């Protein structure tokens, strides 16, 4: 997937390929990649189906040695509703049909098949507003623009880059690491706080990792929210805008359920877009309690672990780093 940003400020769906000519070939055969079905409130099976169709097309025409195919569909419903099967049965049926299509094709050409989870998603019911906590402690610097607040990371004593059940806290004055570690350890929902030395045990002591890495309890996850008053939230907070938010925002999958006219508003914005006018699709809520599924903690129950399915029998559990070798065994 790729987004085009022409000077009109409108952005358009596209895809990237190598060689570059494959992009035009795929979009001539299958249509433009449905980016707006890939993420956001309108995320649906269309993007996953396009990826599957493109994979089969490439395999038939070019016969690559290895196909790595990403099917994102369950990422949406499981984060929105957790493992509430009364709410996700439709999505489960849809992905089942796409997987069947792929398996049927690759079995017909004698390929070895692996079904692999990128991660497992477990139920959550608690949002941890780590940047709000750091702000209340006086560590976060805010710049106000047109009455709205922007996080000034460079001027902040400490701030968090949040990602699902993991939060990286970057600290300007290294002498304050222990103090901040003690403070964030008291937060409800925080299971573990790792300094650089402690990160070594989990093999995550990268030079760009946070001075502190926080891991949430099984039922909790970290937001990026830093404002204390929704009226001062930045304009991009209510948009699907993955580039400007200082952290992951799964609430982008929802339209504001508290606004009874939200679908009419979205339709009006879409009409402006289709007419070539500038528009702001500010329909995303600021309610983190909507999220019912997350991932990232290594401490969840085994039923929520990712899976590795192949034709080889095995009794052992795989470590993530073992997957590479398992794939190579299928090739050589």
Model regions: which residues?
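Short, exposed "boundary/linker" segments that immediately precede the start
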Residues: 1-4
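His/Asp/Glu-rich, glycine-adjacent segments
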Residues: 6-82, 156-161, 165-171, 176-179, ...
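A structure-centric signal for secondary-structure junctions around beta-strands
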Residues: 7, 63, 110, 163, ...
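Acidic, His- and aromatic-enriched active-site or binding-groove loops in soluble protein domains
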Residues: 8-28, 89-97, 132-151
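Alpha-helix N-cap/helix-initiation motif
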Residues: 44, 84, 88-91, 316
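Beta-strand elements within well-structured catalytic alpha/beta cores of enzymes
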Residues: 55, 65-72, 88-95, 99-102, ...
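Secreted, luminal/periplasmic, and some membrane-associated catalytic domains
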Residues: 101-288
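Short glycine/proline-rich, acidic loop/turn segments that cap or connect secondary-structure elements
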Residues: 290-309
């Amino acid at each position: 997937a790729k987004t085009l940003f022409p000077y009109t400020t409108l952005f358009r769906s596209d895809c990237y390929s190598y060689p570059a000519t494959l992009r035009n070939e795929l979009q001539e055969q299958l249509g433009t990649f449905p980016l707006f079905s890939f993420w956001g409130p309108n995320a649906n099976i269309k993007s996953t189906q396009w990826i599957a169709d493109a994979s089969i097309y490439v395999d038939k025409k070019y016969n690559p040695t290895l196909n790595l195919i990403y099917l994102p569909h369950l990422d949406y419903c499981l984060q929105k509703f957790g493992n509430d099967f009364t709410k996700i049965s439709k999505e489960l049926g849809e992905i089942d049909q796409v997987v069947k299509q792929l398996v049927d094709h690759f079995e017909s050409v004698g390929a070895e098949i692996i079904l692999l989870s990128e991660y497992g998603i477990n139920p959550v019911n608690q949002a941890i507003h780590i940047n709000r906590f750091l702000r209340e402690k006086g560590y976060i610097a805010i710049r106000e623009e047109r009455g709205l607040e922007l996080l000034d990371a460079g001027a902040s004593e400490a701030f968090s880059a949040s990602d699902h059940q993991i939060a990286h806290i970057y600290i300007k004055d290294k002498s304050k690491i222990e103090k901040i570690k003690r403070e964030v350890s008291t937060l409800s929902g925080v299971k573990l706080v790792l300094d650089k030395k402690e990160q070594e045990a989990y093999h995550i002591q990268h030079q760009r990792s946070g001075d502190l890495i926080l891991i949430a309890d099984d039922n909790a996850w970290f937001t990026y929210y830093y404002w204390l008053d929704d009226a001062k939230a930045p304009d991009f907070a209510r948009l699907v805008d993955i580039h400007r938010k200082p952290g992951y925002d799964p609430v982008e999958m929802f339209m504001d359920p508290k606004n009874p006219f939200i679908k009419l508003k979205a339709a009006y914005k879409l009409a402006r877009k289709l007419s070539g006018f500038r528009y702001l699709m500010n329909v995303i809520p600021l309610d983190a309690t909507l999220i019912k599924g997350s991932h990232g903690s290594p401490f969840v129950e085994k039923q929520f672990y990712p899976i590795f399915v192949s034709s080889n029998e095995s009794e052992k559990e795989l470590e993530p780093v073992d997957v590479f070798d398992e794939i190579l065994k299928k090739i050589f």
